[in-house]
C-alpha cells in the first residue's frame, strides 16, 4: 500500500501554525510499519486543491487529507473533492441530523454556516466524528482512496485510530510483522550518533531512523519480519552500549515523561527552584496527569532578591560567587528541598542569552544542582549558544537527567559530548 498525505490550510502553508498533525500521523503509521511516502501542503485555493487531488490520486493507494472541513469560506476540501471528481455536493442527511442534535443538546441554535459541514461529494462515504462538528469522508478517485479528516488535532487523532486504521486494515494487506524500539538521547549531535551506529552490523530487516527535536535526538530501531523482530532486543542492547551515557530514556518522548513515570511509581517527592529555565522544568512535569502525587512546588527565583528571600541563599554567597555559580545553585536546591522536606530538589541558574554574558561567564554558562537527603550534586557547564531556547531546553533536560540517574542509583553527573564541563 502506497500511503500519502495532503495537508491543507493557508496558515499551515505560511508557517503561522506548526503542522504537528503531519508529524504525528507519519509517526503513528511508521510504528505500524507503514511508511508515508509523500506529503504535500496546499493553501486555501480551490484550483490548487483540485489539481493536487487529481494528480496525487494517480500515484497513491491511500491519501489522508487533513483540514478544510470547517464551516467558513476558506474550508474548501469537500468542494474541491467534488470538483476533482466532476460531481456535485449533496447534503448528507445523517450528518445534518447529527449537527442539529449536537446544537440542541447545548440549547444553542445551529448557525446556517454549519450546514456546509453536511455537504459532501455525491459519491462520498461519510466518516463519523463523535468529538467535533466536522464529519470526515472518503472518496475513490483514479487509483486512490482519499480519506478526509478534520484539522483539529484531537479530532484527527480520534478519527485515525477509530476509523482510518481499521479502514486500511480492511482494504489492504499490511505487513504488520514489524516492531520499533525508540531510544531518546541527549548531548550528542545526529551526525555523531549516525557515525557511531554505522559500526553496528545490522541483520536483514533491521534499520535505523533518526528524529531531531530540541534538545533530543530520537533513535528508532525498526524491525520488519519475524526473524528481524526476534533480533530486535539484541540489536537494541548493542545500540545502547555503543551510545553509552547519552541514552536517557527508552520508549519515551522526553525526559520529563521518564521522570514522571519513575516519580509517580516511587512515591518520592520533588521541588524545583528555577532561574534561567523560568519554570520550564515545573511546566514539563505538571503537564502529566497525576504529577500532584510527587510534585510539591516550583519556584521561579529570577532575581537575586528572590533567591535570598524565598530560598535562603546568603547575600554573601551571591556577592562572592555570583548568581551563576556552583555555590549559589547548591544553596537554591537545598533551600527548595528544605521548604517542604522534599526527597529531591532541582535548581538551575544560567545565562541563556543572547546578552548578559561576560568573559568569565559567557552566554551558555549554566549551573545545575540536585539536592537529596544524602547530599547535593552540582555541575557548571558551557552549552552551545545557538539560541536562548536551546540553552534553556538543554539546561532543563540535563537537570532532569541528573534526577533520573539519582533515581536509578547511577552516577548523577556524566559527560555529554556536546557539552563542555566547567566545574562540578
Swiss-Prot record:
Gene3D superfamilies: CinA-like, MoaB/Mog-like domain. PANTHER family: NICOTINAMIDE-NUCLEOTIDE AMIDOHYDROLASE PNCC (PTHR13939), NMN AMIDOHYDROLASE-LIKE PROTEIN YFAY (PTHR13939:SF0). Belongs to the CinA family. This is CinA-like protein. It comes from Shewanella denitrificans (strain OS217 / ATCC BAA-1090 / DSM 15013).
Amino acid at each position: 500500500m502506497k500511503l500519502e498525505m495532503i495537508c491543507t490550510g493557508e496558515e499551515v502553508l505560511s508557517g503561522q501554525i506548526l503542522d504537528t498533525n503531519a508529524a504525528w500521523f507519519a509517526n503513528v503509521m511508521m510504528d505500524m510499519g507503514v511508511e508515508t511516502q509523500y506529503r504535500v501542503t496546499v493553501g486555501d485555493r480551490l484550483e490548487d486543491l483540485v489539481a493536487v487531488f487529481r494528480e496525487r490520486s494517480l500515484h497513491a493507494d491511500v491519501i489522508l487529507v487533513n483540514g478544510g472541513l470547517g464551516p467558513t469560506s476558506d474550508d474548501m476540501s469537500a468542494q474541491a473533492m467534488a470538483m476533482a471528481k466532476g460531481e456535485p455536493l449533496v447534503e448528507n442527511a445523517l450528518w445534518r441530523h447529527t449537527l442539529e442534535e449536537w446544537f440542541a443538546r447545548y440549547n444553542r441554535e445551529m448557525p446556517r454556516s454549519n450546514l456546509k459541514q453536511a455537504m459532501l461529494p455525491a459519491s462520498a462515504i461519510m466518516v463519523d466524528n463523535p468529538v467535533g462538528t466536522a464529519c470526515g469522508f472518503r472518496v475513490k478517485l483514479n487509483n486512490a482512496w482519499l480519506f478526509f479528516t478534520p484539522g483539529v488535532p484531537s479530532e484527527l487523532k480520534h478519527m485515525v485510530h477509530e476509523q482510518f486504521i481499521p479502514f486500511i486494515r480492511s482494504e489492504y494487506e499490511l505487513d504488520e510483522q514489524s516492531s520499533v524500539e525508540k531510544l531518546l538521547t541527549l548531548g550528542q549531535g545526529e551526525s555523531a550518533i549516525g557515525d557511531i551506529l554505522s559500526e553496528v552490523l545490522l541483520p536483514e530487516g533491521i534499520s535505523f531512523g533518526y528524529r531531531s527535536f530540541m534538545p533530543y535526538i530520537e533513535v528508532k530501531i525498526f524491525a520488519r519480519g519475524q526473524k528481524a523482530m526476534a533480533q530486535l532486543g539484541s540489536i537494541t542492547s548493542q545500540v545502547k552500549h555503543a551510545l553509552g551515557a547519552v541514552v536517557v530514556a527508552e520508549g519515551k518522548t522526553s525526559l520529563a515523561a521518564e521522570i514522571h513515570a519513575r516519580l509517580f511509581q516511587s512515591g518520592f517527592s520533588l521541588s524545583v527552584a528555577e532561574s534561567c529555565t523560568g519554570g520550564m522544568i515545573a511546566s514539563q512535569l505538571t503537564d502529566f496527569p497525576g504529577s500532584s502525587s510527587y510534585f510539591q512546588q516550583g519556584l521561579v527565583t529570577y532575581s537575586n532578591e528572590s533567591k535570598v528571600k524565598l530560598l535562603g541563599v546568603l547575600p554573601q554567597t551571591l556577592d562572592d560567587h555570583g548568581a551563576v555559580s556552583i555555590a549559589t545553585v547548591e544553596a537554591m536546591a537545598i533551600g527548595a528541598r528544605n521548604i517542604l522536606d522534599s526527597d529531591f530538589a532541582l535548581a538551575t541558574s544560567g545565562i541563556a542569552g543572547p546578552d548578559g554574558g561576560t568573559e568569565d561567564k559567557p552566554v551558555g554558562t549554566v549551573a545545575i544542582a540536585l539536592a537529596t537527603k544524602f547530599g547535593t550534586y552540582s555541575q557548571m557547564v558551557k552549552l552551545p549558544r545557538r539560541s536562548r531556547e536551546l540553552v534553556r531546553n538543554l539546561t532543563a533536560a540535563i537537570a532532569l537527567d541528573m534526577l533520573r540517574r539519582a533515581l536509578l542509583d547511577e552516577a548523577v553527573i556524566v559527560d555529554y559530548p556536546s557539552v563542555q564541563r566547567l566545574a562540578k
